[in-house]
Amino acid sequence: VTGDSLETLADAQDFEYERRFLVTEFPAHLRDAPTLIVQSYYLADEGYALRVRVQASGLDAALDADSTPMSVLADHRGEISMATVTVKGPAVGGTRYEAERGLDPEVALELVHRGGRAMVKTRYSVWAGGDGWSVDVFGGANHPLIIAECERSGPVTDLQVPAFCVTELTDDRRFSNESLASTPYGGWVSAYLAELAATGPRLRADFGTNARLLPD
């Protein structure tokens, strides 16, 4: 494979395009297609990250502030069915370099147990406004954080934003998963909510036209 071919391959496959939003209340009737995720970060610096993730599809774990990543894995290790290793670059304008490949789940489980900074969350899939959304409900030190993401194969413009989204977090590095692994939301939630109350919610104006959906 030539250098030009590798560059073309990276351009086609190795980027993610997403917008992210804070959720404070996620309706129970929308909590469909759950996936338990535990992931550990072995490098996280200025937007660059190296991550190992293990997950169990169809598992709706009841996560709370006491749900540490290792205790959750101890309870559900036998249900882990998929694992990946991922390299990420800094996010700019809702676009981020991301290269990912599959791992043997048993090897990945041992890696998560043996090092890195781990976090746990349950991911739900929601269809809203013509887009598929992922809604992550965090446990452990990041409880009670909930983040909704809309990802497309190209820039996420002219978005219909669900009613459960409170304010946009796109490109706010504090809310990147690698930042949350090292500086969990539970330690600064009060300060952030005070900041949000002072500044008010926002939607980015540089991604085309935003529309608000009515509650489902």
Feature map (PLM): residue ranges:
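Phosphate-end processing signature that detects enzymes handling 5′-triphosphorylated RNA
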Residues: 2-216
